[in-house]
Amino acid sequence: MAAPTLTADGPRLGQQEMKKMSPSFHPTLWGDFFLSYEAPTEAQEAQMREKAAVLKEEVRNMIKGSHDVPEIVDLIITLQRLNLDYHYEDEINEKLTVVYKSNYDGGNLDLVSRRFYLLRKCGYDVSSDVFLKFKDQLGNFVEADTRSLLSLYNAAFLRIHGETVLDEAISFTMRVLQDRLEHLESPLAEEVSSALDTPLFRRVGTLEMKDYIPIYEKDAKQNKSILEFAKLNFNLLQLRYSSELKECTTWWKELRVESNLSFVRDRIVEVYFWMSGGCYDPQYSHSRIILTKIVAFITILDDTLDSHATSCESMQLAEAIERWDESAVSLLPEYMKDFYMYLLKTFSSFENELGPDKSYRVFYLKEAVKELVREYTKEIKWRDEDYVPKTLKEHLKVSLISIGGTLVLCSAFVGMGDVVTKKIMKWVMSDAELVKSFGIFVRLSNDIVSTKREQREKHCVSTVQCYMKQHEITMDEACEQIKELTEDSWKFMIEQGLALKEYPIIVPRTVLEFARTVDYMYKEADKYTVSHTIKDMLTSLYVKPVLM
């Protein structure tokens, strides 16, 4: 694609050249908090790690000693929900083979549902026909105990296209669970309520870890070693996350956003949460830090081009990024120069940190940034010309890239270890179907909650407005129908992930993890822009340890 220029692709003379009134975003809720956050002493941390190591081996022996399918399924799902499974990948993979080969198709709805959920989530090709036996002669699902229906409900959200039985299972179980909810006791009541809000498969792993510990503690069948290890593991991860937040905050403060770029959203802690939700296991520390920095840059670009820069300034910035050279800073207005130089400096630091064997990955990252900005310039042209794409499909040709989904995935893989190859980096940048489905999901989820806010000023038309015009319906009707399209995107992502056999499981798993974070951040509101809504959650995740 040709680089954006200041001539043919630029704005008409005099158009949009008055400096815009930037929207008023609330200031940072965190400031320097993580720069002065006091972690436990080295002696305290060493004691925690020593105890955790003992418990880790106890749980390992439990996994090795599990033989019956029901026992294996329950144990692995519990470890996944408590975010302990990454400690036992080899042992769990061995047990998953046992579960898969069992071909269990008995009449226990709870077990059939949980087995299906576990295997499909872990990438196994299992048939949804196992649920047909739980229908009556009229084709309706037969009522069962609440625990079994909850398991069926959670399993059904791993549906792909053509699985009518799972579509029907969701409708049936949702209605019954809603009717029964007020009559349930703890902890089942909390489980059902949480599932109706967000099905188990769609929950952000770090949040599920935090939220499930107190539920598991109330479970009559809880194992004390697993519970204690889960609490220690949470607290140790919290120390790691807090340390990474200190590093990211230090990096962010160097940019002096509050004085140099006061019109952008100052959300470094929220960015870290959003991005770490996509790769939260401890071994992905480098990915989390790279992701946080990249999405902080995306935020600056988005807020600058959307709401502050003139069209001419926007094209100047786009050309400078296309050139990707310090000499291009001369193209820019003063307020953009520090940001541009810091962008280049940060990318150079990525190359140095990755070393000679992995620094090639940063090339793909640069190309993803350039591609993002090229699509931004197309949206600026739409805005300046008051152009509304005729169809949603036309809009998405531009906006599924400009939302940044490809760049996020590229950033995640750049920071991972030897599992990521040049083949994977090329795949991310190649318009792969799974990457496109993810981009569409992010775009539609974003636009549902941001359209009303953004249209208070002159702004590029959203997918919602495009859909309204295409189908001659109201905004509320368009949002409801687009929500159905996001459900379609979930189906696409799951089936495309299952089909991606030539790549390691971490590839489709990472895409789905980021889909979960997007679902959370855009559910009901834009929690990134209006981050008061998640302040308490972030405090419980990064500041308050779990009581032992």
UniProtKB/Swiss-Prot annotation:
Pathway of action: Secondary metabolite biosynthesis; terpenoid biosynthesis
Motif (DDXXD motif): 302-306
Induction remark: Up-regulated by herbivory and fungi (e.g. Fusarium spp., C.heterostrophus, F.verticillioides, R.microsporus and A.parasiticus).
Entry binding sites for Mg(2+) 1: D302, D306
InterPro entries: Isoprenoid_synthase_dom_sf, Terpene_cyclase-like_1_C, Terpene_cyclase_plant_C1, Terpene_synth_N, Terpene_synth_N_sf, Terpene_synthase-like, Terpene_synthase_metal-bd, Terpenoid_cyclase/PrenylTrfase
Cofactor: Mg(2+); Mn(2+)
Any one GO cellular component localisation term in the record: cytoplasm
Binding sites annotated in the UniProt record for Mg(2+) 2: D302, D306
Other information: In the presence of magnesium, the product spectrum is shifted toward an increased production of (S)-beta-bisabolene and a decreased production of (S)-beta-macrocarpene.
Entry text on domains: The Asp-Asp-Xaa-Xaa-Asp/Glu (DDXXD/E) motif is important for the catalytic activity, presumably through binding to Mg(2+).
Oligomeric form and interacting partners: Monomer.
Protein's recorded name: (S)-beta-macrocarpene synthase
UniProt source species: Zea mays (Maize)
Underlying gene: TPS6
